[in-house]
Every structure is written in structure tokens, then in C-alpha cells.
Amino acid sequence: MRLRIPRLLARWAAITVSISALLFFAAGTTHVSSLRSYLAVFSSLLLATMLTVDPDLAKERAHPEDTGVDDGLRFAARLLFLLTLTFAALSVGRLRHTFNVPTHARDGGLVAFAFSGALQAWAMVVNPFFSPTLRIQAERGHRVIADGPYRFIRHPGYLAMSISVLASTLAIGSWIALIPAGAFVLVIRRRAQLEGEFLRNSLSGYIAYARKVRGSYAG
């Protein structure tokens, strides 16, 4: 535990600094209130999630086993996420398009972003197998999870990610960033569909769970 906390804080700081540097560089300034507010919420959600997630899951997510099943979609999703943030920061900074998004919409976007972060954290806390790769974690006793948000919808993590990226564009104040954000949502939905098919074929009890919980972000 003594070693875990310093490493966790170092990783949190590295991610926060990296994302902040990306946004402020794209904006060309640090004097954009919507960016500062967004980064404050982003950093807080990230730290809260990292502190509450299961240590074994944190290790799995930090060093996932490479299965090659969906590498293309994972890469595309990460790229589109970064493009969305870059476009948004560029729009409100160097291009000065902040006025295109009303204040109440930016505030609503920030609230939606915080909600998505809470939903994502909830899913990760109740699901110790929340891995970024498609694989059955037999070495950790992989089983179907039907608690928390999984009682209401399959793939709540993907729903949270989609809300998060769409809300980020509004919270920062950019309409144009909805273009890469929309592409991100399409990629994530396809990824959720692939995961659903994979789990139906590979995880014992998942078919029965899918029959019981009809709601699915994968469609």
C-alpha cells in the first residue's frame, strides 16, 4: 500500500499534466476559464477513480494482455479522444469560437462530464474485470457482473465514455469538436458490439445475463 499510493499519485500527476499541456498548447493560452474548469473536474474524477478502483484491476488496466482482437478500434478511440480535446481547445483558444456555445450549455456539459465520470468509476468499482482488452481473465476467476450499473444496462462503461467525450466538447465550449466526438461514439459503439459478441461466445453465464438485462449500449 505504501508503494501503491506514491505510484498512483505519480501516474495521476503525469496524466493530468499531459492532458493540461495538450489543451493549453492547442488553445495557445492558459487564460480560458472553460478549459481550467474542465481540467479541474477531469483531474478530480481521475484521482477519485484511481483511489477507489481495485488494485488488481488497476494493474490489469495499466498492463493489459495484448490479444490483438480489437487493437484497431482501441487505437482509433484513443486518437479520436485526443483529437476531440485538441479541436475543442483550438476552437476556444486560437480560433476564439467560445461564443458559439452558450454559458448554460457549457455548464450543462460540465455537469454531464462529471456524471459520466461517476458512472465510469461506479462500473469500474463493481466490475473487477473492467479491462481495456477483450479477453477472459481466467487467472482472476472472470465471471459475469450483474451489480451496480450492470443491473440496468450492459456495457455501462462504454455509455459513460460516449457521454464523457460528447460532454467534453460542450464543457470546453466548442461545437466543431462534436465532429471527432461523434466519430468516437461510433467507434465505441462498434467496440461494445464486438465485446458483447465475444462475451456471449466466451463467458459462462453471459447469455443468461443478456436475456435478463435487456438494456444494452451496444444496441
Question: For the regions a protein language model found, what residue spans apply to each?
Answer:
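Membrane-anchoring alpha-helices and their flanking helix-loop junctions
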Residues: 1-150, 159-219
